[in-house]
Each structure stands twice: as C-alpha cells, then as structure tokens.
Amino acid sequence: YNEIALRKGVKLMKDIKMPVVIPAVDIKSSKKFEFNNLKNESMYISDSSVGKAVRAICSFPGVFCPCVYKEYSFLDGGILDNIPVNEVKKFGADKVLAINFKADDIDESSNFMDISMRTLDIMGNKISEESLQNSDFVLTVETDKTGLLDVNKIDSCYNFGYDAAIKNMGKIKTIFKV
C-alpha cells in the first residue's frame, strides 16, 4: 500500500501536504481513531505509514482480517464514521470536499452477495447523512457496478473518481477558491 505514496515522496501520514483524516475502529475497544497528518494525540495517529492507514480502512469486517498497528486491531472506520467531515473541520479545515460512492441498484438478477452489499450501502449511507450535509461539496462517484470487494477493479475505480473530479472541477475550484 505504500508504493503509490512513496512515488509521490510521501512515507508517513504527517508528510501529506493537505489535511487528511482516515477513520478506523479498534475492534478491541470499539473506539474510533483517525489516521491523519495534523495531530498526534491518543485517538489520532500521524506517525504511521500511509500504507498502514490504507490497510486499516480496507479491513472490512467479515472479509479481511483486522489491521494490527501497535496495540490496536483496526477495522474500516466506516463502521462508525464513513465520511469524517466533522473531524476534518475539528482540525481547522474551512471547507470540506466529501467523496461519496453511488451504490448500484438491485434488480431481479441480484444474488445474495449483491443484496448483502446493498444492505451495507444503506447502513453506510445512513451513517454518512450528517457528514454529507456538513460538507461544502459532495463529489459523487459512480462505480459502474463495481462492488466493495472487486479489488481487481482498483484502476477502474481510480478512473471513476478522476473522471468525476474533472467533470466537477469548475464547481470545486469555485467553492474552494483554487
């Protein structure tokens, strides 16, 4: 997970130039932690590698093992806070761009896994409602039937996000005055 970050000269979370908050949940304590580049307090982790933070948020319950970091065992932070807008604002961000992935529709050809994943999407969307309302701009990314577990489609997902950002660049520049 560090390979891409290292290509950009970034090794640790604290090396990232713009504010970043990546939520994770310690399965042992049920507490939320944030991998970030802004604070170094007990619930905030800025001394980890970017790869470790990414691995933690990829630890989807029931699918991937928890990510062990120091004395913690992290799962995907979306369990408690899927889009940490309020956390980013606590760190002083004036404006927040939230990224939301559009869930695919269920139809008569949907199987058990499709329905299970859609159920998780519904729960995640409910958890995210307040955060999305508190953000200054929501970039919605359509994933063309790419599911959470379709790890072989990572390049496609990157392209979906890139295309959505380019399509909305005018609005983004206006809101964020870039």
Task: Identify the function of each model-found stretch.
Residues 1-178:
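Patatin-like phospholipase
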